[in-house]
Amino acid sequence: MAVKPIFEKENILVTGGAGFIGSHLCDELIKKSKVICIDNFITGQEDNIDHLLKNPDFEFVRHDITEPLEIEKLSELRKFKVKFQGIQKIYHLACPTAPREYNKIPIETLLANSHGTKNILELAVKNKAKFLFLSSSAIYGEPLEKAPFKEDYWGFINPIGPRSCYNEGKRFAESMVMNYGKKYNLEVKILRVFNSFGPRMRLDDGRMIPDFITAALEGRDIEIYSPQEATSTFCYISDLIEAIQRAMRSNFSGVVNIGNPEELKIINIANEIIKLTQSASKIVFKKPLPFTAKQGLPDISLAKEKLGWFPVIPLGEGLKKTIDQMKGKSRVVGIENINFNK
């Protein structure tokens, strides 16, 4: 098969492009490429991409990836000459990611990682496109020892537990990606992403930092569903987006961890948020929820070696940017009455 011509810019497909990570990725890709954003808004949000809709190099397609996608037949993509140029790169991020809703959308989560991943891989095969899959540290399960997770660790997972639809879904998707890559000689990359945070995170999906910030801005108790000595790691969104782009540009194919290896006490994160918001909130500890899990640490040696990547944004700086964006969210009751500049 002859290589399709590339006109003035590459055509890039981003599934889950209206989500927290996907929308930030689209912001960067649109600077040099034509971007096709796919989402069905199960956990993505339209306001994440509103600012991109008038850009002539951006096109949003509302579609459930568990259904086949015949991209070349979409009339709205004629301007990208997809029928002639095809798609050069695919970033597959689409997966419902809302810990508080795992028990509400388990089948949707499993199908996105199985049927959905297969459908997008078929597009990659048809277009001979480079393929990047955003996996998760969840495939490792809970740590059995203090050592950071390396890519060659197989994981300790409960296949029928409260988080199984997400954890096992990601594990199956990784297997699908790797086997498609081998069978069809595709260039595939898998990024196992550890905790990340930043502007545009949903305020209601059960993630720790948005929950803490929302509580602090409303003056409510900050509830920590873990022991007082519990720790975790957090990577700011701009560092994560840089890692994703470096991975796609690199010659590296395979699996790589992406995360911040700095281990932080959760209570210290809560106290920092209270300080930055000038909140009167108090910290209370509660019994862990069913969908919560003990977090492991990332070993990012391979990311440093193969991608030349490591996180550079300090937690405090990332929290300030996240809080500034969340203060503008109308869904957070009472924020407009707080004086943050005193």
Q: Where are the language model's segments positioned?
A:
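Residue-level signature of the cytosolic catalytic core of signaling kinases
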Residues: 54, 145, 161, 201-205, ...
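N-terminal Rossmann-like NAD(P)+-binding domain of SDR-like oxidoreductases, especially those catalyzing
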Residues: 1-196, 238, 325, 329, ...
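Short, conserved catalytic or interaction motifs in soluble domains
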Residues: 43, 199, 260
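C-terminal substrate-binding subdomain of Rossmann-fold SDR/epimerase-dehydratase oxidoreductases
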Residues: 4-5, 27, 63-66, 119, ...
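Nucleotide-sugar-dependent glycosyltransferase donor-binding/catalytic pocket residues
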Residues: 67, 110, 201-202, 233
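Hydrophobic alpha-helix immediately C-terminal to the catalytic Tyr-X-X-X-Lys motif of short-chain
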Residues: 172, 176, 180, 212, ...
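Amphipathic alpha-helical segments in well-structured domains
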Residues: 117, 209-210
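Short alpha-helical
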Residues: 44, 97, 203, 264-265, ...
